[in-house]
């Protein structure tokens, strides 16, 4: 096999490998990040569906609510998950119908609804979290831990660069 093409698995999902010149390094990095993120997300979605009969958005909502035991305002959930309130409402409606969450009016502003996990919601999330961690760890098991730590730091640098770039607009 030609060394430029890599392994068969790589050639089917490694869109950036065809871009070789250094002038396109930024684009190659972005495409590699996107490819890896999509591959991980696809596996997590499949596993959540198969093992827990749930979806990634439902898992994400439960996990975000869990970060604030006093409850998360609907608007804050939307902001954290980067979706509109219109997308969040039906999702929370379904979670409430399944008794995984409850909505309570804010003590400070009764127009604001705080979403809290029920005991059933906590139990469901507690079952999913270690499995999610295992799935992601399994996907990254062949990356040397020191290199993974470097990658984490580099991605932090990238995030900082993006935030500075956005602030400069």
Question: Which residues are covered by each model-predicted region?
Answer:
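Charged, amphipathic alpha-helical coiled-coil/dimerization segments
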Residues: 2-17, 93-153
């Amino acid at each position: 096999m030609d060394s430029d093409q890599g392994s068969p698995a790589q050639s089917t999902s490694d869109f950036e490998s065809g871009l070789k010149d250094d002038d396109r390094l930024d684009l190659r990095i972005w495409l590699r990040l996107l490819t890896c993120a999509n591959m991980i997300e696809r596996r997590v979605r499949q596993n959540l569906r198969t093992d827990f009969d749930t979806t990634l958005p439902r898992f994400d909502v439960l996990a975000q609510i869990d970060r604030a035991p006093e409850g998360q305002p609907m608007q804050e959930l939307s902001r954290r998950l980067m979706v509109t309130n219109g997308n969040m409402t039906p999702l929370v409606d379904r979670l409430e119908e399944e008794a995984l969450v409850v909505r309570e009016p804010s003590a400070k502003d009764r127009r604001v609804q705080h979403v809290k996990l029920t005991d059933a919601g906590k139990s469901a999330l507690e079952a999913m979290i270690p499995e999610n961690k295992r799935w992601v760890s399994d996907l990254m098991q062949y990356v040397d831990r020191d290199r993974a730590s470097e990658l984490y730091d580099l991605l932090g640098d990238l995030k900082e660069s993006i935030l500075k770039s956005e602030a400069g607009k």
